[in-house]
């Protein structure tokens, strides 16, 4: 890479002649100048080149990826309860780890709802989180609510454990899910394909068994 040139200044010396009176009016004039007298040295400034390598370069600005983590503790009016953790690295997808107990064996709709309001139990958490104004669908569908997380399956002991990865439920930014509520439902979510009048809004997943507000937690 060719060196860049930066101009600085340094001192050099120029000479100027100042006339002085001569005591001999009959002297012939000098052939080298119309003046004669003493010289005075005056400093002036001329540019001098300096390569960029001799200048201290600023240190690069480094941005570190930030990991964010949140948790929701689910409770309801029945014996259904659970803990859900959400983790996001930088601006990547969010990983959701679910463990819920007290469920009937089988599939249960699992959604993120718009509000973190549980003053009236899970009913006051509002509809599915849907910032794009789309209809209900499966997690892998192009047309879906951001809060459509599909189904979780409870075993014969009523325990559902699952790990979900989704890129529509970030923990920061304008569509952050922090402060909203996770809800587990009574029935299987038909993923918008059941043909029921509620299929395109709730997946016809039935009642809300337990819910919890998503809150940030230390890493």
From Swiss-Prot:
Where is it mostly found? plastid
Listed binding positions for Cu cation are: 111, 113, 128, 185
**Superkingdom to which the source organism belongs:** Eukaryota
Transit peptide, from-to? 1-65
Disulphide bonds in the chain: 122-211
**Which Enzyme Commission numbers does its entry carry?**
1.15.1.1
Q: Which reaction does it catalyse?
A: 2 superoxide + 2 H(+) = H2O2 + O2
Keywords linked to the UniProt accession: Antioxidant, Chloroplast, Copper, Disulfide bond, Metal-binding, Oxidoreductase, Plastid, Transit peptide, Zinc
A Pfam entry, by short name: Sod_Cu
Q: Which cofactor does it need?
A: Cu cation; Zn(2+)
Annotated compartments:
Plastid, Chloroplast
Q: Please name the GO terms that the record assigns under molecular function.
A: copper ion binding; superoxide dismutase activity
Check the record and name the InterPro entries matching this protein.
Answer: SOD-like_Cu/Zn_dom_sf (IPR036423), SOD_Cu/Zn_/chaperone (IPR024134), SOD_Cu/Zn_BS (IPR018152), SOD_Cu_Zn_dom (IPR001424)
Q: Which Gene3D superfamilies match?
A: Superoxide dismutase, copper/zinc binding domain
- How does this polypeptide assemble, per the annotation? Homotetramer.
Similarity field: Belongs to the Cu-Zn superoxide dismutase family.
Its recorded name reads Superoxide dismutase [Cu-Zn], chloroplastic
